[in-house]
Regions:
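Active-site-proximal loop/helix segment associated with metal-binding centers of metalloenzymes
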Residues: 1-15, 36, 53, 57-65
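Metallo-beta-lactamase
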Residues: 1-27, 76-90
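Histidine-centered divalent metal-coordination motifs
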Residues: 31, 35, 97
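Active-site-proximal beta-strand elements of phosphoester/diester hydrolases
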Residues: 23-29, 48-52
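Cap/insert and terminal regions of metallo-dependent hydrolase folds
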Residues: 39, 43-125
Length: 125
């Protein structure tokens, strides 16, 4: 990796970064330090490629923390941050490890979150 970095073909980020118009890279800790979650904004909505922050549509409860998250308390806080924004901004969350549910909006119900309306990724324009 050092050779790739030295060649200028790898750019490391230390803060949330705008990659280009419509694509922001945001950092989330917990599963691993500095996990990148791309936020893709279209005229219709923002899509969140959540990686391991919310791996499955059924893991919307903030208390559902993966056993392999290296920092579970941090993971809980980061998951809450992502879910709060997704619910309030009506963002579409893409579940990277879910074989059955590809993408949904998120709805807050009392102190918990759940997958709400399915969103087709074919509609991204």
């Amino acid at each position: 990796m050092q050779a790739v970095y030295d060649s200028g073909k790898l750019r490391l980020i230390e803060n949330d970064t705008n990659l280009c118009p419509g694509i922001d890279l945001r950092l989330f800790d917990g599963h691993t330090p500095g996990q990148i979650a791309p936020y893709i904004t279209t005229p219709e909505r923002t899509y969140v490629f959540d990686g391991n922050v919310i791996p499955l549509a059924t893991s919307g409860s903030p208390l559902w923390i993966s056993a392999y998250d290296t920092y579970p308390v941090v993971s809980y806080n980061e998951k809450m941050r992502m879910l709060e924004e997704a619910a309030s901004e009506k963002q579409a969350v893409i579940y990277c490890h879910d074989a059955y549910t590809q993408c949904t909006t998120v709805k807050k119900v009392n102190d918990f979150f759940k997958a709400d309306q399915k969103v087709s990724l074919f509609s991204i324009g």
